[in-house]
């Protein structure tokens, strides 16, 4: 690649990169609804597919409005992700997650999650703060 009369190859592009990120962007399991599928059924299916954790092993927190993340994509289309708060019934390790879609899967505290989310993603950070506040306020374990 030639840019500003300077030649770049893959090595020089990597060496001269000034990105602050060592890993791909961190996020929540999500996906598109199938035909006639409700938001909640889609969320449970995607969670199970991407994490390998059986949906019977989580409990959606009732009486809690789902969290929504709305943004404009690089294609200038508006997108909305809907997230449901849930808790694990039995703790499990991640052993069979969908490696074709997920490069890394791990448990994080809310503070670790906030650090893992990039600074420009303010809505996602706020979702983490809101969930932590609700779980603390109502002593959800």
Give residue ranges: language-model regions:
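Unchanged
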Residues: 1-26, 31-129, 133-134, 139-140
């Amino acid at each position: 690649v030639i840019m500003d009369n300077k030649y770049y190859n893959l090595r020089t592009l990597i060496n001269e990169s000034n990105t602050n990120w060592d890993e791909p962007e961190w996020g929540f399991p999500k996906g598109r609804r199938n035909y006639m599928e409700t938001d909640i059924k889609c969320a449970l299916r995607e969670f199970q597919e991407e994490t390998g954790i059986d949906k019977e092993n989580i409990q959606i927190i009732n009486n809690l409005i789902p969290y929504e993340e709305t943004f404009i994509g690089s294609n200038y289309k508006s997108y909305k992700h809907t997230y449901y708060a849930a808790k694990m019934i039995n703790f499990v390790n991640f052993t069979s997650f969908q490696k074709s879609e997920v490069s890394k899967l791990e448990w994080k505290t809310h503070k670790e999650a906030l650090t893992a989310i990039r600074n420009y993603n303010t809505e996602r950070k706020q979702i983490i703060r809101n969930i932590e506040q609700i779980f603390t306020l109502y002593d959800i374990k």
